[in-house]
């Protein structure tokens, strides 16, 4: 294996492992986040299932964590065998999977961020009150979980770039092609 291929494979492995860790951390932080307040003898509990966007984030992060863990195993096995390049159909499958994971998680982050802003700031036009003034611990832990999910999403975008490079290098120039000077 060439040095550049080893470095790229190592970078991909580290990114995929970090995706698994950050996505799992986000999942744990969000799912375990609850806070109970007593309002005039009525118990009100804030939990992640109250906002559908956050449920979407939990599902997306669970899928991403498992997918990245499986791809990390594939990277380790490929590195041990010394095989870097794949067949075109397999490279297309990895590229498509990486793209799907990146888009899924970016969409989940965007939806959850909007819900978070509404929970923090409220919406006067719709008479929605600020929830985070009442459930401070809940909102803080949720913000940390969403930040972890954001880091996982950023790593997924970089993995998608590496995956695209690995795919399109299979379509590189051949020796039979004529080059035109510019």
UniProtKB/Swiss-Prot annotation:
Lipid bilayer topology: Multi-pass membrane protein
Tagged with keyword Transmembrane: yes
Ranges that cross the membrane: 13-31, 53-73, 90-110, 142-162
Residue ranges annotated as Extracellular topological domain: 32-52, 111-141
Cell compartments where the protein resides: Cell membrane
Superkingdom to which the source organism belongs: Eukaryota
GO CC, alphabetical: plasma membrane
Family: Belongs to the Casparian strip membrane proteins (CASP) family.
Subunit structure: Homodimer and heterodimers.
Official protein name in the record: CASP-like protein 2B1
Organism in which the protein naturally occurs: Arabidopsis thaliana
